[in-house]
A protein has these predicted regions:
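Conserved mixed alpha/beta catalytic, RNA-binding, or beta-rich assembly cores of soluble enzyme
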Residues: 1-96
Length: 96
């Protein structure tokens, strides 16, 4: 399992706990959104905008409430990560 959190183009170093937690969260959210199976899941967050890519193909996120909830979950994760405090673009990448 490979997990990356990239803030404004800079990959953050995650300890084993945060790596596992982030991977589990990304996987669970993608599954809850009923996405197709894939080898790479990537959430991109810029302000209130949230995009999901599965194997580099964008998956439309049309549910406003789901988008807001997912954004809040990711903001919660980011609040615990050193190096994410002043970022404007956040990428969560999970490759099972």
């Amino acid at each position: 399992m490979s997990v990356s959190v990239i803030v404004d183009g800079i990959k953050l170093t995650l300890n084993p706990f945060m790596s596992t937690l982030t991977g589990n969260v990304v996987s669970a959210i993608a599954g809850s959104l009923k996405t197709q199976e894939g080898k790479k899941f990537e959430f991109v967050m810029r302000g209130e905008e949230l995009q999901l890519f599965v194997d580099d193909q964008e998956i439309p996120l049309s549910l406003g409430q789901a988008r807001r909830i997912v954004g809040n979950v990711f903001r919660g994760l980011l609040s615990s990560l050193h190096g994410a405090e002043t970022g404007t673009e956040f990428r969560f990448i999970f490759e099972p």
